[in-house]
Swiss-Prot record:
Pfam families: COesterase. PROSITE patterns: CARBOXYLESTERASE_B_1 (PS00122), CARBOXYLESTERASE_B_2 (PS00941). This is Esterase-5B. It comes from the Eukaryota. Disulfide bonds join C84-C103, C259-C271, C515-C536. Residues 1-19 form the signal peptide. Its main location: secreted. Belongs to the type-B carboxylesterase/lipase family. CDD domains: Esterase_lipase.
Length: 545
């Protein structure tokens, strides 16, 4: 907390005394010294700017500390950001280790050819399960083409380095969320030096990034760093976001890397700090039950109230019900087949048998379902888990077997349990207990190729509108073809205009194309905007009792 107050106090001086050189816009003055960016034609980039001290040595498993080094030479801001160290499931081969432990940076992208002297700001928190990915995983050429917004991408600690927790004050966890928070403070205090408007900051994220954004909003002081927020296909109530069972995983991690003698959190933390980061991160493979399931063995937790600088010390449901969260305009979204992100891997044909993994669910459903659907640690007995697994299977598949032919029913189950239901519950709770506008949209417009085809490694299946089909119209991604259809081009431009208008709105209104979003606060029903290739329309759903 002291660090945040110090930054906010110093920020007033920084904003008034720091600015880019009008004669050389690539040269920017910061409190740490001068930096030089890159000219990319229609925008300038200033990449890999440190916002925190390297989280190594004694600073590993600690809250991030503001970066305070002074540059004697001009800082080279032309190098792309490194990945935070991770065990990347999408790397081929046995060694999936990537990235560096010293990785806490932001990258700033500023329009070049524009009549504006200053720009509103979009801060992006990247996704991918709190385990891998990075600030450079999504492109930004499409985003920058309109020339209306500054984009800032945030890197933060991932996996066990970012989220291991013993559930007490000694190894509290949520270090990745605390990184994000410090990065947002850095943006608030320094973005004016790049021509940004610190009073007009919109924070967005997709998937784990969306869940992160919502968790940031659930801090009352979020309004000090941002004006509004959007969570795409991820929010704090999704069952894969806030985890239980962290203490057991923390000590299991210790056992794997040679800290098995530790019987308390202090000893475990000290031992883990002495181990190579590569060993800690590589241990992730030991937590996978099959393929890369569970997707998120290490993620956000509810911290002990005694933890120093706790990020959250209550469950998000309780925070929302208390009304003690940031009263800023917030939007949340999902796609009609969001669950394809978790289900599509089951359609990959196995090299050993030539059959799809989904067939094995017929014999392994009770073993695998709790990990696939993230209720393994939320139920106390095997009987409870088996009863719930049986109920889910009966509700969505009846007596039919798991197969390629029944895949869509399984995908619908995954969408409902992991995304749709929790999004609507979150929307309803904000409607009842919030004061600022709350919006939602559901996206239904399948990409020609998307994350479903990428995970299943096949193109003969129609996956529908899966995870990312909307977000990747804003930020291009390698999993989908770069050339947009004519309908996607229109939607893409409407999304970009939506972001621009939302951050500039004085009363928190939100619109997409010709459709105005309906505010859920004060409404007797849930209000969602449906976006398809044919346009948009408002939907009303019954609220929860």
């Amino acid at each position: 907390m002291y660090c945040e107050k110090l930054i906010l106090l110093l920020g007033c001086f920084w904003i008034s005394s720091s600015a880019s050189d009008p004669a050389d816009p690539l040269l920017v003055d910061l409190p740490n010294g001068k930096l030089r960016g890159r000219d990319n034609g229609n925008y300038y980039s200033y990449e890999s700017l440190p916002y925190a001290e390297p989280p190594v040595g004694d600073l590993r498993f600690e809250a991030p500390q503001p970066y305070k080094q002074q540059w004697t030479d001009t800082f080279d801001a032309t190098q792309p950001p490194v990945l935070c160290m991770q065990w990347d499931q999408f790397i081929q081969g046995d060694d999936k280790l990537a990235g560096n432990e010293d990785c806490l940076t932001v990258s700033v992208y500023r329009p070049k050819n524009s009549s504006r002297n200053s720009f509103p700001v979009v801060a992006q928190i990247h996704g991918v399960a709190f385990m891998f990915g990075g600030a450079s995983q999504n492109g930004h050429e499409n985003f920058m083409r309109e020339g209306n917004l500054i984009l800032v991408k945030i890197s933060y600690r991932l996996g066990p380095l970012g989220f291991v927790s013993t559930g007490d004050a000694d190894l509290s966890g949520n270090f990745g969320l605390k990184d994000q928070r410090l990065a947002l403070l850095w943006i608030k205090q320094n973005i004016a030096s790049f021509g940004g408007e610190p009073e007009n900051i919109l924070v967005i994220g997709h998937s784990a990034g969306g869940g992160s954004v919502h968790l940031q909003v659930l801090r009352e002081d979020f309004s000090k760093v941002a004006k509004a927020a959007i969570s795409f296909s991820g929010n704090a109530l999704d069952p894969w976001v806030v985890q239980q069972g962290g203490r057991g995983r923390a000590f299991e991690l210790g056992r794997i890397v040679g800290c098995g003698q530790a019987s308390d959190s202090v000893t475990l933390k000290k031992c883990l700090k002495s181990k190579p980061a590569s060993e800690i991160v590589s241990a992730v493979r030991n937590f996978l039950v099959f393929a890369y399931v569970p997707f998120t063995p290490f993620g956000p937790v509810v911290e002990s109230p005694e933890a120093p600088e706790a990020f959250i010390s209550q469950h998000p449901i309780d925070i929302i019900k208390s009304g003690k969260f940031a009263q800023v305009p917030w939007a949340v979204t999902y796609t009609t087949e969001d669950g394809g992100y978790n289900a599509a891997l089951l359609l990959e044909k196995q090299a050993s048998s030539g059959r799809e993994l989904i067939v094995d669910l017929n014999d392994r459903w009770f073993d695998w379902a709790p990990y696939l659907l993230f209720y393994r640690d939320s139920m106390t007995t095997i009987k409870d888990m088996d009863d719930y697994s049986r109920k889910l299977r009966q509700e969505y598949l009846g007596d039919r077997r798991f197969s390629v032919e029944s895949y869509w029913d399984l995908q619908r189950l995954f969408t409902d349990v992991l995304f749709k239901n929790s999004t609507e519950i979150s929307l309803d709770l904000h409607r009842k207990h919030g004061k600022s506008p709350v919006y939602a949209f559901v996206y239904d417009n399948p990409a020609n190729t998307g994350i479903g085809q990428g995970l299943a490694k096949r193109t003969d299946i129609n996956f529908g509108t899966v995870h990312g089909d909307d977000y990747f119209l804003i930020f291009e991604n390698i999993v989908r073809e770069p050339q947009l259809r004519s309908d996607e081009e229109i939607i893409s431009r409407n999304f970009l205009k939506m972001l621009n208008d939302f951050v500039l709105s004085e009363n928190g209104t939100l619109a997409f194309g010709t459709c105005d979003f309906q505010d859920n606060v004060g409404s007797s029903k849930l209000q969602l905007l449906s976006i398809t290739r044919n346009g948009c329309e408002n939907l009303e759903l019954e609220s929860f009792p």
